[in-house]
């Protein structure tokens, strides 16, 4: 009797399981079909229009995507980032620590210092060109000229005149009457060359105290007959504590930002 009861219970449970499985499959199919239908009804439709203006809009879209992809390079080429990041890299080499601070830390610090230096320029650029473009008060070419004006003015305030004359000659364009009339494609490489030159000049000054420490440590080791000890390993702690005692990071960051302000003022 117990065996028959057990079989009946098992049979009932098996029947319930089959019924539940069928219901689950049907529910899964319904859940899969309903969102697909809803997505088909509310699919995003990108309408570029028809007629003669279609090609122009496609070209504008491609141009916008190109500018967005080149935005990091534009930031590097036309701002204070070049000088700052090169100086920070040379400082790390002068101290003698090749991997500390790591590259992401130096790049992040350079970006923040660049934002401080370029904030007034970016504000003028936004007010002159980007805001009128967003308010539909200017067309794109006119807005680009207006927005690039403050950036070009900043680069001209920092560029070396000999470097600017070099790229004017290399570009084979008519001699501009004033520096402000120089095309942006000529000002940008001249600005980058000038920034690299100034960064190397600052790097040279940063190397001198650490080089003196290396020479002193090497002389002491030689006088003590410790020829086998690498001077760089012995001098590294002294260079680190020297940099900390003189508050080196504050001096370097402050001097870098002030160097652009002096250049703009001059």
From Swiss-Prot:
UniProt GO cellular component terms: bacterial-type flagellum basal body; plasma membrane
Subcellular location as annotated: Cell membrane; Bacterial flagellum basal body
GO biological process annotation, one example: bacterial-type flagellum organization
InterPro entries, per the entry: FliP, T3SS_IM_P
Membrane topology, record value: Multi-pass membrane protein
Keyword S-adenosyl-L-methionine: no
Main location: membrane
Pfam families referenced in this protein's UniProt entry, alphabetically: FliP
Stated role: May be a component of the flagellum. It is required for normal cell division. May be implicated in the secretion of virulence factors.
Name of this chain's protein: Flagellar biosynthetic protein FliP
């Amino acid at each position: 009797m117990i065996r028959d009861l057990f079989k009946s219970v098992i049979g009932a449970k098996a029947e319930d399981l089959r019924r539940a499985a069928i219901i689950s499959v049907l529910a899964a199919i319904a859940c899969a079909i309903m969102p697909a239908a809803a997505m088909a009804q509310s699919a995003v439709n990108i309408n570029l229009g028809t007629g003669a203006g279609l090609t122009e809009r496609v070209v504008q879209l491609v141009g916008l995507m190109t500018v967005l992809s080149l935005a990091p390079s534009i930031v590097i080429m036309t701002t204070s980032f070049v000088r700052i990041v090169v100086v920070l890299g040379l400082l790390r080499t002068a101290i003698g620590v090749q991997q500390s601070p790591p590259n992401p830390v130096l790049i992040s610090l350079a970006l923040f210092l660049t934002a401080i230096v370029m904030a007034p320029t970016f504000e003028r650029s936004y007010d002159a060109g980007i805001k009128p473009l967003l308010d539909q008060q200017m067309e794109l070419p006119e807005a680009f000229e207006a927005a690039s004006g403050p950036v070009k003015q900043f680069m001209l305030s920092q560029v070396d005149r000999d470097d600017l004359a070099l790229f004017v000659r290399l570009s084979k364009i008519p001699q501009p009457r004033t520096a402000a009339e120089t095309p942006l494609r000529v000002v940008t490489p001249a600005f980058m060359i000038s920034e690299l030159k100034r960064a190397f000049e600052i790097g040279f000054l940063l190397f001198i105290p650490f080089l003196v420490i290396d020479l002193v440590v090497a002389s002491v080791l030689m006088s003590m007959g410790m020829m086998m000890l690498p001077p760089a390993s012995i001098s590294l702690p002294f260079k680190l504590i020297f940099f900390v005692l003189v508050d080196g990071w504050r001096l370097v960051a402050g001097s870098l930002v002030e160097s652009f302000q002096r250049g703009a003022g001059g």
